[in-house]
């Protein structure tokens, strides 16, 4: 069976730093898509894991750590938080660059809450792990969460929302190889190229087993001329 070269190139696409910088110039820190780009590039999260991150609960600046403990997924028109793929709960180290981005987002979130007041949309996790949003001036007896990505007024940004970001990168920036998973793949490749132990790569990315890591990254690196 002939190989679809375009499909193969799309699947294996690694985003060069210069290209990633160009993407961030289009989606700067003031954009509600910004963190959905910088987190997988720096941590290697899956798209559902990225959007399930809680800025208040999952980030520990004192330990320079980020917890990956869920993924956002949709059933019909409702979004839920469920355990990550393969139940791969993990805590990963983060660097100063990502910490700076996260601190800015947290600060801006607080500013926007004051700006919008009662009209700000707070996000809650219901007992069935579904997500709902309610105006800040309405009291709700459920657990409030702080999603990684929201609009200025608190409106939830989801993996479906990211499709718009990808379309802009495809058509406005002219990068048709870009896709949501490529930033995770790029991070894993950078780790492998940097000589990081395969077991460490496996644990950081939440792979099911070491064979997946070796097949996806290490073999690709050793195959390079």
What role is predicted for each listed range?
Residues 38-42, 51, 65-67, 101, ...:
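Generic alpha-helical hydrophobic packing signal
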